[in-house]
């Protein structure tokens, strides 16, 4: 079995693959203070709850945008799975030309998403990932990574609004009954949901105008289904795109 780990600034997503089949997946908080023992015990508990045997893990692959956690995660893998993990980074065989001024600047998660999306759809693409930051990654019809855009994430915007506007409460990120809110909570939700939908559709329209081929727009991340349900540009949602990309990259670099 393959253990795939996607470490984001806010959440860490884990998946267990048997061949090309995702057997189980979890989302946990990314913690800078957990020790490798605490991470190891947490994973063993998750495996036990799913009826999975840690001893059956033959490989581990990790994409992380939190460099300080690299040593902790490596030690966790070695001590609790007896496996040295493969980290996504410069020098890895991606099968995708990275046409960025400095390819080393491209986050591991963005490369992983791009590889997974092109492997599945084989066409010009925009991958929108709703994480701590909302990222747009553009892939050409030839399978080249062209670049993209980075925006503040939905959670960051919600936190900033609640922190900076003392009379505005923190609200659940949910689609309101109408874009015209009839109370404070609904008004904030309307601004967040339709504001982000407008941003996504606007940026994707600008990207399409610059490309020779109209791109398919794919969304991933925990909030992708909600935004996709309102967006005019998003045509596909794959919440496990990053995990699938990790599986593909592991296969290409074994």
Curated annotation (Swiss-Prot):
<keyword id="KW-0630">Potassium</keyword>
<comment type="subunit">
    <text>Homodimer.</text>
</comment>
<feature type="binding site">
    <location>
        <position position="100"/>
    </location>
    <ligand>
        <name>substrate</name>
    </ligand>
</feature>
<keyword id="KW-0479">Metal-binding</keyword>
<keyword id="KW-0808">Transferase</keyword>
<keyword id="KW-0963">Cytoplasm</keyword>
<keyword id="KW-0418">Kinase</keyword>
<feature type="active site" description="Proton acceptor">
    <location>
        <position position="109"/>
    </location>
</feature>
<keyword id="KW-0067">ATP-binding</keyword>
<comment type="function">
    <text>Catalyzes the phosphorylation of pantothenate (Pan), the first step in CoA biosynthesis.</text>
</comment>
<dbReference type="InterPro" id="IPR043129">
    <property type="entry name" value="ATPase_NBD"/>
</dbReference>
<feature type="binding site">
    <location>
        <begin position="6"/>
        <end position="13"/>
    </location>
    <ligand>
        <name>ATP</name>
    </ligand>
</feature>
<feature type="binding site">
    <location>
        <position position="129"/>
    </location>
    <ligand>
        <name>K(+)</name>
    </ligand>
</feature>
<feature type="binding site">
    <location>
        <position position="132"/>
    </location>
    <ligand>
        <name>ATP</name>
    </ligand>
</feature>
<dbReference type="GO" id="GO:0015937">
    <property type="term" value="P:coenzyme A biosynthetic process"/>
</dbReference>
<dbReference type="Pfam" id="PF03309">
    <property type="entry name" value="Pan_kinase"/>
</dbReference>
<feature type="binding site">
    <location>
        <position position="184"/>
    </location>
    <ligand>
        <name>substrate</name>
    </ligand>
</feature>
<comment type="similarity">
    <text>Belongs to the type III pantothenate kinase family.</text>
</comment>
<keyword id="KW-0173">Coenzyme A biosynthesis</keyword>
<dbReference type="GO" id="GO:0005524">
    <property type="term" value="F:ATP binding"/>
</dbReference>
<dbReference type="GO" id="GO:0005737">
    <property type="term" value="C:cytoplasm"/>
</dbReference>
<dbReference type="GO" id="GO:0046872">
    <property type="term" value="F:metal ion binding"/>
</dbReference>
<dbReference type="GO" id="GO:0004594">
    <property type="term" value="F:pantothenate kinase activity"/>
</dbReference>
<protein>
    <recommendedName>
        <fullName>Type III pantothenate kinase</fullName>
        <ecNumber>2.7.1.33</ecNumber>
    </recommendedName>
</protein>
<dbReference type="InterPro" id="IPR004619">
    <property type="entry name" value="Type_III_PanK"/>
</dbReference>
<keyword id="KW-0547">Nucleotide-binding</keyword>
<comment type="pathway">
    <text>Cofactor biosynthesis; coenzyme A biosynthesis; CoA from (R)-pantothenate: step 1/5.</text>
</comment>
<feature type="binding site">
    <location>
        <begin position="107"/>
        <end position="110"/>
    </location>
    <ligand>
        <name>substrate</name>
    </ligand>
</feature>
């Amino acid at each position: 079995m393959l253990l795939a780990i996607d470490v984001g600034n806010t959440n860490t997503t884990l998946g267990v693959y048997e061949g090309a089949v995702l057997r189980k997946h979890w989302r946990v908080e990314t913690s800078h203070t957990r020790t490798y023992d605490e991470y190891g015990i947490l994973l063993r508990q998750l495996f036990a709850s799913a009826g999975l045997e840690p001893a059956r893990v033959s490989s581990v692959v990790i994409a992380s945008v939190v460099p300080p956690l690299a040593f902790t995660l490596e030690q966790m893998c070695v001590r609790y799975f007896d496996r040295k993990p493969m980290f996504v980074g410069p020098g890895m065989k991606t099968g995708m030309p990275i046409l960025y001024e400095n390819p080393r600047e491209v986050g591991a998660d963005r490369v992983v998403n791009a590889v997974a999306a092109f492997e599945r759809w084989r066409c010009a693409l925009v991958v929108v990932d709703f994480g701590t930051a909302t990222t747009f990654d553009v892939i050409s019809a030839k399978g080249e990574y062209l670049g993209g855009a980075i925006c503040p994430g939905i959670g960051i915007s919600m936190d900033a609004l609640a922190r900076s506007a003392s009379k505005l409460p923190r609200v659940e990120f949910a689609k309101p009954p109408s874009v015209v809110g009839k109370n404070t909570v609904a008004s904030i939700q309307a601004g967040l949901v339709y504001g982000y939908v407008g941003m996504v559709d606007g940026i994707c329209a600008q990207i399409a105008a610059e490309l020779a081929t109209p791109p398919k727009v794919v969304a991933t991340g925990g909030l992708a289904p909600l935004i996709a349900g309102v967006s005019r540009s998003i045509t596909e949602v794959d919440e496990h795109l990053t995990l699938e990309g990790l599986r593909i990259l592991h296969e290409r670099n074994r």
